[in-house]
Amino acid sequence: PIGEETIKNLKLLFQKDTKEWNKPKYEIARASISSKKLDVEEIASMTLPSVVKLEGDSGLGSGFFINNEGLIVTNMHVVAGGDKEFTISGDDGLKDQGEVIYVDSKLDFALIQANNIKNSKALPLCFSKYPRPGQNVIALGSPLGLAGTVTRGIVSAVRQPSSDLEDVVPYYVTLIQTDAAISPGNSGGPLVNSNGEVVGVNTWSLPGDEGRAQNLNFAISIVDILRSLNSENPGKAENTNSCGNIVEKENIFKFW
């Protein structure tokens, strides 16, 4: 069974929010994806410019851009300290302030709007399908404030919360289990597949100790987040991959 301390920590993540938030309207744009599977170095170089460190008075975390107008996804527990304004910084010298505009406590995610960034590089999203066990993934973020950190692993499982967590994590939350390391400060960063598409938002890890399993890390599915936002999927198109993005025959990789 899962320990009492872990359940206590999860209750802090998936807590009820008494504030009413106006749900923003978000339309998904298809990305153009190379037909070639990319190695970790390629994915990191293309993804890191879209990953940011978030700093508030109560702590820090990670996030990433989902559109070209400075809209950032992160975890709710990153912004749960009461801060409304956050400092946004990127691995490439990017610096700005941003404001929390939406919080979903049931799925532990939040949206932050950057004040001045209007040409952000959005990451492609795997919006139409959950990943499969065994797929390669990398986690990006700022563990302990160390911006631009990349860890690699596989999807260990895609699961609904176990019976141990049924009173803590909502039943409709899909957890992506991975052995890619997720550490404090990594929360809110993207978990991406070998095409560089976001499959989840890094959320928490199960602390390991003597007699317990190691490398149990979890992300919230981007599919569930987009569904919660009532995001509008683009219409049907030819040459799309399982994530819904357009596959290019050439060995290129570009964002919309």
Placement of each model-derived feature along the sequence:
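Active-site substrate-binding loop(s) of clan PA
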Residues: E42-I43, E99-I101, A114-A147, S183
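A conserved glycine-rich beta-strand in the N-terminal activation segment of trypsin-fold
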Residues: K36-E41, S50-E69, L94-Q97, A122-P124, ...
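Active-site region of chymotrypsin-like
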Residues: L48-S50, A114-P124, V150-N230
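Short conserved beta-strand and strand-loop elements enriched in small hydrophobics
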Residues: L54, K84-D91, V137-G141
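Catalytic-histidine neighborhood of serine endopeptidases
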Residues: E5, L60, N67-D108, A114-N119
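N-terminal activation segment of mature serine protease catalytic domains
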Residues: I2-F65, M76, D83-K84, F109, ...
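Short, surface-exposed secondary-structure boundary micro-motifs
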Residues: D57, N75-H77, S142-P143, T203-W204
